[in-house]
Design a protein with these regions (language model features):
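ATP/NTP phosphate-donor binding region
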Residues: 1-91, 347
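A glycine/threonine-rich phosphate-anchoring loop and its flanking beta-alpha core
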Residues: 10, 20, 113-210, 304, ...
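Fold-independent oxyanion-binding glycine-rich loops
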Residues: 16-17, 37-39, 68, 95-97, ...
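Short Gly/Thr/Asp-enriched flexible loops that form oxyanion-binding sites at enzyme active sites
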Residues: 51, 78-81, 100-114, 147-148
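Glycine/serine-rich anion-binding loops at beta->alpha junctions
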Residues: 89-105, 139-145, 277-280
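Active-site segments that bind and position negatively charged phosphate/pyrophosphate groups
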Residues: 203, 207-332
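C-terminal charged capping/lid subdomain of soluble metabolic enzymes
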Residues: 313-389
């Protein structure tokens, strides 16, 4: 196992009836709060009123920024930065899913610099050395942004969707109440589950063979998704299902499973190009890509990892031929994503045309070949897009 540093000091309030602690946590950082959220869902489920009550009881001054988009835009980040600077905001409170939290992270960072927040991204990205404190209330189990140092922002003007990692982006406190996800519809529950699964598979499929502890941890999380995602779809107010998905979402991407693993992610840079141009749901794009990426990477040098995955996650008979186990593991992954979760199978089903495949492949490899489970060139990425067609 390679050396690594693990430092995720986010304080988590998990479970029902935890919002009573919101006021005291915010007051640790100041009294001027920027409340950020997306559309009207937090108002429809009564969460908005609950949050405002807690904030007013704490005696803080509240400023609001609503309308943060799925695949959040740099324009929303800029507006948040403007409010932070003009109103001398002390702490940001993001209420929503990963899009709201991601946008809020870069508002918090942008408030501490003079340059445009888009300069945090790209090949010549400026450093993120500090950010205003961030507190989150999670309403969707998917991205894990509530407990990680990352965020992804879209720029429609340039046609880019880019991610960034930086320790100051880590939320100080996150409230994870599974009941707040009861109202999430089947489609978003399915997309969120696919997103969580991809976060794990991106790390799990690795050529290092000395990470038994981390591999078994990841296999447990994968089995959790396979078990509880269908339950959440059938019984949206099943607390155990929602709780297991929510906690798995956080641990899938908070840095723990990365310990000692050095390979780059493969499906995420490819998917970012799909949603940058076509604005599809991130988890859906990952679902379409993942089985084809797995199929493309399968050969005699990688087959053992598929065997481990198929036997330990899906219970495939270990006595079968190795290549047959590998192929069956891919088939079962696709069956879970497309049949069990009910997500679309192909890019053409969601309106993505071959005409942009080459351009998207080039942009996915903007920093060079993707050095993941198997190194992917522009041509490789284009081939995977074609397999998804």
């Amino acid at each position: 196992m390679n050396s690594f540093i693990y430092n995720i000091p986010t304080k988590v309030y998990f479970g029902e009836n935890q919002l009573g602690n919101l006021g005291k946590e915010l007051l640790k950082f100041g009294k001027r709060v920027l409340l950020t959220y997306g559309g009207g869902s937090i108002k429809r489920i009564g969460l908005y009123d609950r949050v405002l009550t807690e904030l007013h009881n704490a005696g803080v001054e509240v400023f609001e920024l609503s309308g943060i988009e799925p695949n959040p835009r740099i324009e929303s980040v800029r507006e948040g930065v403007k409010i932070c600077k003009e109103q001398n905001i002390d702490v940001l409170l993001a209420v929503g899913g990963g899009s709201t939290i991601d946008a809020t992270k870069f508002m918090a960072a942008g408030a501490c610099v003079e340059h445009d927040p888009w300069e945090f991204f790209g090949a010549n990205a400026k450093p993120i050395e500090r950010a205003l404190p961030i507190v989150t209330i999670l309403t969707l189990a998917a991205t894990g942004s509530e407990m990680d140092t990352a965020g992804v922002i879209s720029n429609l003007e340039t046609g880019d969707k880019l991610g960034r990692l930086a320790q100051p982006l880590l939320p100080k406190v996150s409230f994870l109440d599974p009941t707040l996800t009861y109202s999430v519809n089947k489609y978003q529950t399915a997309c969120g589950s696919a997103d969580i699964m991809s976060h794990i598979l991106e790390v799990y499929f690795n050529t290092q063979e000395d990470l038994y502890m981390l591999d078994t941890f990841m296999e447990g999380m994968l089995k959790t998704i396979v078990k509880f995602a269908p339950v959440a779809l059938a019984e949206p107010e099943n607390y155990e299902a929602r709780a297991n998905l929510m906690w798995t979402s956080s641990w899938a991407i908070n840095g723990f499973i990365n310990g000692g693993k050095r390979k780059a992610w493969s499906c995420h840079p490819m998917e970012h190009e799909l949603s940058a141009i076509y604005d599809i749901t991130h988890g859906l794009g990952l679902a379409i890509l993942t089985p084809r990426w797995m199929e493309y990477c399968l050969d005699e040098t990688t087959v053992d990892k598929y065997v481990q995955y198929g036997v330990n996650v899906f219970g495939i008979d270990a006595k079968m031929d190795k290549m047959e186990i590998a192929k069956e593991s891919i088939r079962l992954t696709a069956e879970f994503l497309f049949d069990t979760l009910g997500l679309q199978r192909t890019l053409s089903e969601v309106g993505i045309k071959r005409e942009n495949f080459h351009t998207m492949a080039q942009k996915a490899c903007r920093y060079g070949d993707i050095k993941g489970f198997k190194t992917l060139t522009v041509k490789d990425v284009e081939c995977i897009f074609e397999m998804c067609e």
